[in-house]
Amino acid sequence: MTKIPMQPADSTPATFHPNAPTKTNILGMNQEQLGAYFKHIGEKPFRATQVMKWIYQHGVTDFAQMTNLSKGLREKLSEQACIELPEVMHKEFSEDGTRKWVFKVAGGSLVETVLIPADDSKVNGRKTLCISSQVGCALDCSFCSTGKQGFERDLTAAEIIGQLWVANASYMEGVDSTEWQNNVTNVVMMGMGEPLLNYTPVVSSMGLMLSDHAYGLSKRRVTLSTSGVVPKMYELYKDIDVALAISLHAPNDELRNELVPINKKYPLSELIAAAKAYVHDNNPRHKKHVTIEYVMLAGVNDSDEHAQQLVALLDGLPSKINLIPFNPFPHAPYDRSSNNRIHAFSNILNNAGFVCTIRQTRGDDIDAACGQLVGQVADRTRRSAKWQQSIKQRAANEQQSEG
């Protein structure tokens, strides 16, 4: 059974507050939390599963429409509770079928979510949702635009699971059907933020994704991507059974310290050990490998020697390698590796016995590709101002050095 940690008492708005003057947002509560809420308001805890099915399997956010609840309970919930979704500020559609939403969350901050269909011509084909876990990111990876925006705050479980709810709802717009359909088939925690630095809300949200009373996704269809928060990796496989991806991007500590600064705290030896533990100590039926993500930066990490170092580093770790062509952003200090270089790098890995794929860039025309999520639309946050100031300072320094 999946173990879902309870959210801390101050994790608003997805947590029940008995003395709060406003309505309690029950979106994002897991079965245990929602059962406790119903018990507090004088109702049977089993009502939790009924309400969860209405919210996540039928797309209902109006208590009055939850017809298997008594009229009295529906009225009580309408008075005391709410199902508050993140506000859609903007949405864009790419020519390749990719969709991007910009959400406004509590406090006015903006986060982005991306849905990538495997083939937009197939109504029932694979649709992968890339979900954000934080407003901005504190890790400051040098090749990622999100990190350059700085960190503002963690998202709540309601704000995380709400992204999935809205994505499913968007597919129902204009559909001639009286039945709700959950069209998202895969979820990847690869959007804005480092998921393991927002541990409890992220794990609780993934629990809803897996729960038979909510979305009921397969464990193999929910993936968490981490840059390497090693202590939390050891906790993760004890708390929930999902697929793991590692944002590696370099085959040695010297280079990874530059590209992924968290490596200075948790070096590659510790990261790979944690990944091996995740594979071998967890249920082997569901954890046959981890996915290794590796962005291809021209002249930085894409040489034959780097590929050979990567082969040695991953020895003994069941893994699949996903090479990601770099997606440029304004003032990025890197260029994308050439297609020939990427394929040569891939061939070395394949010849060494690894399964290596090259990610197809999707959604780059709407700034929805990997590494491009920054909440650009109507972004007036402190993060944006800080980034703009750094650009001006860099330009001033360059002019000064030229002079």
Swiss-Prot record:
MF GO annotations: 4 iron, 4 sulfur cluster binding; metal ion binding; rRNA (adenine(2503)-C2-)-methyltransferase activity; rRNA binding; tRNA (adenine(37)-C2)-methyltransferase activity; tRNA binding
Keywords: 4Fe-4S, Cytoplasm, Disulfide bond, Iron, Iron-sulfur, Metal-binding, Methyltransferase, rRNA processing, S-adenosyl-L-methionine, Transferase, tRNA processing
The Radical SAM core domain, residue ranges: 123-364
Pfam families: Radical_SAM (PF04055), RlmN_N (PF21016)
Superkingdom of the organism of origin: Bacteria
Enzyme Commission numbers on file: 2.1.1.192
Catalytic activities: adenosine(2503) in 23S rRNA + 2 reduced [2Fe-2S]-[ferredoxin] + 2 S-adenosyl-L-methionine = 2-methyladenosine(2503) in 23S rRNA + 5'-deoxyadenosine + L-methionine + 2 oxidized [2Fe-2S]-[ferredoxin] + S-adenosyl-L-homocysteine; adenosine(37) in tRNA + 2 reduced [2Fe-2S]-[ferredoxin] + 2 S-adenosyl-L-methionine = 2-methyladenosine(37) in tRNA + 5'-deoxyadenosine + L-methionine + 2 oxidized [2Fe-2S]-[ferredoxin] + S-adenosyl-L-homocysteine
Localization terms from the record: Cytoplasm
Principal location listed in the UniProt entry: cytoplasm
Region described as Disordered: spans on this chain: 1-25
Cofactors named for this entry: [4Fe-4S] cluster
Catalytic residues of the enzyme: E112, C370
Gene3D superfamilies hit by this protein: 1.10.150.530, Aldolase class I
Disulfide bonds: C130-C370
Single GO cellular component term: cytoplasm
SUPFAM superfamilies listed in its UniProt record: Radical SAM enzymes
Biological process per Gene Ontology, one example term: rRNA base methylation
Cofactor details (free text): Binds 1 [4Fe-4S] cluster. The cluster is coordinated with 3 cysteines and an exchangeable S-adenosyl-L-methionine.
Top-rank EC class of the record's enzyme: transferase
Residues annotated as binding S-adenosyl-L-methionine: G193, E194, S225, S247, L248, H249, N327
Binding site for [4Fe-4S] cluster: C137, C141, C144
Functional note: Specifically methylates position 2 of adenine 2503 in 23S rRNA and position 2 of adenine 37 in tRNAs. m2A2503 modification seems to play a crucial role in the proofreading step occurring at the peptidyl transferase center and thus would serve to optimize ribosomal fidelity.
Annotated family: Belongs to the radical SAM superfamily. RlmN family.
More details: Reaction proceeds by a ping-pong mechanism involving intermediate methylation of a conserved cysteine residue.
PANTHER family found in the cross-reference section: 23S RRNA METHYLTRANSFERASE, RADICAL SAM CORE DOMAIN-CONTAINING PROTEIN
Record's protein name: Dual-specificity RNA methyltransferase RlmN
Organism listed in the record: Psychrobacter sp. (strain PRwf-1)
Gene name per UniProt: rlmN
